[in-house]
């Protein structure tokens, strides 16, 4: 096989852009959709083949998805990278952004190690329709179980991680002070407003009023930047969300990162398992989704860049035009998906996606396991 069509590239690019971020498994859909269509699609788009132009295409759409994540969270990544650089320079973590950067690195280590060791055998042995369908069903079960446990812990009033405060409280962790204007214990003239997460300039614009008496740490614990009160509302909300995430204990961030390794199996969603892991550690749906997106960015980008030689080498011959087209489609769809999901998780859960995975996975098990 020497190439695949632009139609195939456009459809799979759109699927990758959406399913990488929706908790429904991009790799699973990349296996199942061509197999369901059959014919030339099944022959051209076989992810389990050891030498295939489709692998070069998958590399390109992954890089495009990572680029969309970076663009959507551009302001956040600028602060996170700056915080990391400052912490390296000073040899200690003094800001919430710096601490969040190290938590992301910590959460990336497990999937980096496991991916380097097992990505190829997992893809070649499990990248077939029936295993992908089974894992897609398992993915739905995991998300349903996670949502049920989350509801149960919320009903019982179980506390979140130490130092973590969800979007219903002033989202400034005690463990990551920032420099600037001092905040006293005297109540403010009006209620403070804490917003949910928003990617970059961010779509999240719903707010909740809270009182300083119950939510604001004492003056000796935290300071606020002078310029923060003049920031746009969405950027202030994004900073607050990052501070909540920066309050996660290191072990919790590591556990979320370990959960991400399950996504190496086709059918298991990276964003889905990391979100459920975040919920299990006490994060809100909005913050769990935000952390999943931030954690996925370096992993997806690194996976794409490591295999870029495949695209530039013989595997990419004859498909570079289709690959560029598919990558553009994937990037646009991924960006739209990020903004949609940021709004979705402000008020909703992952249950509809879990039900979809259960139904679609079960039907595909019947299709490829029996017929």
From Swiss-Prot:
What are the annotated GO cellular component locations?
Answer: plasma membrane
Keywords, A to Z, come to:
Antibiotic resistance, Cell membrane, Cell shape, Cell wall biogenesis/degradation, Hydrolase, Membrane, Peptidoglycan synthesis, Transmembrane, Transmembrane helix
Any single GO BP term = response to antibiotic
Report any Pfam family annotated for this entry.
BacA
The text of the family note is: Belongs to the UppP family.
| Membrane topology (UniProt) | Multi-pass membrane protein
A single Gene Ontology MF term assigned here is:
undecaprenyl-diphosphatase activity
Compartments where located? Cell membrane
* Broad EC category: hydrolase
EC numbers on record: 3.6.1.27
Q: Main role?
A: Catalyzes the dephosphorylation of undecaprenyl diphosphate (UPP). Confers resistance to bacitracin.
Additional free-text comment from the UniProt record: Bacitracin is thought to be involved in the inhibition of peptidoglycan synthesis by sequestering undecaprenyl diphosphate, thereby reducing the pool of lipid carrier available.
Name of the molecule in the record: Undecaprenyl-diphosphatase 1
| PANTHER family for the chain | UNDECAPRENYL-DIPHOSPHATASE (PTHR30622:SF4)
In terms of superkingdom, the source organism counts as Bacteria
What chemistry does it catalyse, as a reaction equation?
A: di-trans,octa-cis-undecaprenyl diphosphate + H2O = di-trans,octa-cis-undecaprenyl phosphate + phosphate + H(+)
- Residues crossing the lipid bilayer are 53-73, 100-120, 126-146, 291-311, 322-342, 351-371
Q: Where is this region: Disordered?
A: 152-226
């Amino acid at each position: 096989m020497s190439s695949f069509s632009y139609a195939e590239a456009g459809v799979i690019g759109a699927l990758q852009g959406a399913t990488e971020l929706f908790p429904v498994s991009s790799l699973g859909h990349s296996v199942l959709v061509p197999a369901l269509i059959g014919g030339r699609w099944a022959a051209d788009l076989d992810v389990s083949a050891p030498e295939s132009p489709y692998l070069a295409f998958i590399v390109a759409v992954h890089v495009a998805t990572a680029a969309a994540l970076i663009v959507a969270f551009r302001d956040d990544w600028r602060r996170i990278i700056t915080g990391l650089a400052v912490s390296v320079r000073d040899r200690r973590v003094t800001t919430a952004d710096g601490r969040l950067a190290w938590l992301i690195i910590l959460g990336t280590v497990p999937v980096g190690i496991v991916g380097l060791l097992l990505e190829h055998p997992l893809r070649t042995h499990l990248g077939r329709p029936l295993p992908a369908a089974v894992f897609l069903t398992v993915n739905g079960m995991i998300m349903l179980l996670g949502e049920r446990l989350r509801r149960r812990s919320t009903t019982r009033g179980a506390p979140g991680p130490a130092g973590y405060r969800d979007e219903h409280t002033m989202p400034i962790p005690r463990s990551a002070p920032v420099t600037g204007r001092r905040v006293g214990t005297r109540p403010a003239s009006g209620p403070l407003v804490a917003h949910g997460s928003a990617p970059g300039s961010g779509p999240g614009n719903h707010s909740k009023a809270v009182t300083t008496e119950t939510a604001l740490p004492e003056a000796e614990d935290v300071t606020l930047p002078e310029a923060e009160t003049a920031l746009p509302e969405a950027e202030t909300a994004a900073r607050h969300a990052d501070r909540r995430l920066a309050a996660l204990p290191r072990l919790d961030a590591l556990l979320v990162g370990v959960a991400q390794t399950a996504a190496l199996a086709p059918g298991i969603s990276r964003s889905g398992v990391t979100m459920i892991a975040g919920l299990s550690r006490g994060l809100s749906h909005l913050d769990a989704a935000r952390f999943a997106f931030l954690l996925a960015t370096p992993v997806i980008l690194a996976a794409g860049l490591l295999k870029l030689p495949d695209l530039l080498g013989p595997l990419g011959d004859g498909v570079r035009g289709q690959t560029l087209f598919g990558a553009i489609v994937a990037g646009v769809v991924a960006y739209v998906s990020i903004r949609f999901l940021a709004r979705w998780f402000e008020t909703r859960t992952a249950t509809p996606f879990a039900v979809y995975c259960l139904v679609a996975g079960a039907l595909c098990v019947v299709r490829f396991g029996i017929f």
